[in-house]
């Protein structure tokens, strides 16, 4: 599904699953082949604050990669790797990354990610504070481990915990700003 409300190339969109007011839109995006947490809001300031890299809001991803990841590869990701963004090389900011066992709340993907079960895979927990186009996929590929599955688990203090796939949870502006650690601006 596309993480937008307008259709494109006949692919399913948010409009096919959620009935929300016209002024509600996704804050940030997920790639077509990614899954996980997506915020929907009608607050333009939230979009600006959350997506501005100066504010360094954390995004946590659970990443299934092909192969048994080495410590050397993890160190390279931690330090920052050079990736291509729109035809220009970009050095990613240092980040947190660790190997971990497949999270319990992650079910099997439908359709399956791959059919070659004899090749090992690894799960990574990766936390970044910037959000370039397909950044996580490019980072893991750069160190030799293509991403098979990508799940955004957390944005700052908002997580997928206690949410089923496709489930929506309403938050007040105060709750949202507190969880995202965004200070409310004073009205003039």
Regions found by a protein language model. Give the residues of each.
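RNA pseudouridine synthases
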Residues: 1-188
